[in-house]
Amino acid sequence: MLGARAMSAVAVLTGDYHLSKRYTQLLLKDFFNLPASVGTISNAEEIVSEALKAPVEEAKEHIKKQPCVNADETGHKQQGKKMWMWLAATVFVAVFIIRGSRASSVAKELLGEFFNGTLTTDRYSGYTWVDIAYRQFCWAHLIRDFIKISERSGEAGRIGDQQ
């Protein structure tokens, strides 16, 4: 049985760094002279996952009740399949979920069906179910869009070049 720190290390190595159980086993042995079987590593993953269930659910519920939330989503491939990493963040809490969809149903899962705070996002249509009076567009996204417009040819570019 591994101690709390070793189990935490296993969780980071296999979860965050995506090391296989075999590589995690080798790393523990080579760096810490800590022998651990693949089964021990699997058990540590299970124990850490179970220990994190309640805090993760608490964080998800916290997000849904906040007066101001920033949200975004970004696509990536996971084992060759298109996936989306969704983020909802407040000053103190950030929640990430990975789903195979960019649909508004995932935004509702993350923020709650009846989110009633102020939501800062890009202009992605998956958030249009939130009343526009409670949506704020992300300044960084707007600046990037303005720069792209200013780099166009024609009238838009001419106006964009003015100071």
What are these regions (language model features)?
Residues M1-Q163:
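Catalytic center-proximal scaffold of phosphoryl-transfer enzymes
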